[in-house]
Amino acid sequence: MSKLKEYRVNRQIRAKECRLIDENGQQIGIVPIEEALKIAEEKGLDLVEIAPQAKPPVCKIMDYGKFKYELKKKEREARKKQREHQIEVKDIRMKVRIDEHDLQVKLKHMREFLEEGDKVKVWLRFRGRENIYPELGKKLAERIINELSDIAEVEVQPKKEGNFMIFVLAPKRKK
């Protein structure tokens, strides 16, 4: 978790005077710190130094506990939003001579990943003599692409690399 900025509150404020803003956001003007503290105390709120670098520093009358809570809430929302937008690439590996039921299970997993917005990298593995029949891999790749064509588009075309044929599917963009 990131560290929230610490603000000086009430008696922690060291300035002699400040530019005061009330709880409604109205600027009151430049007043001595003691007077600002008195006004805040009368209203049952805190005096918070929100811009210490300004000359004179800017202080606002507010409920500091509520202010900190709102800041934490905004930070949580920002982190959540950031997490939602991360696209992962999920790997699915299978043999070229995969059984029908196993293929259906793999297709189901790929469909779930694509519906969640993730990309899917498919690795078709060739073993032994299968290497001399790359058309087996091409057929399987075409079948997978056709089965998922309603929700996915090919981002990287099927390509043979060593003992694997690799291609990447991405979720279709919403219009």
UniProtKB/Swiss-Prot annotation:
Keywords: Cytoplasm, Initiation factor, Protein biosynthesis. Its main location: cytoplasm. SUPFAM superfamilies: Translation initiation factor IF3, C-terminal domain, Translation initiation factor IF3, N-terminal domain. One of its GO terms (molecular function) is ribosome binding. InterPro entries: T_IF-3_C_sf, T_IF-3_N_sf, Translation_initiation_fac3_CS, Translation_initiation_fac_3, Translation_initiation_fac_3_C, Translation_initiation_fac_3_N. One of its GO terms (cellular component) is cytosol. It comes from the Bacteria. It is found in: Cytoplasm. Pfam families: IF3_C (PF00707), IF3_N (PF05198). GO terms for biological process: ribosome disassembly. HAMAP family: IF_3. Belongs to the IF-3 family. NCBIfam families: infC. IF-3 binds to the 30S ribosomal subunit and shifts the equilibrium between 70S ribosomes and their 50S and 30S subunits in favor of the free subunits, thus enhancing the availability of 30S subunits on which protein synthesis initiation begins. Monomer. This is Translation initiation factor IF-3.
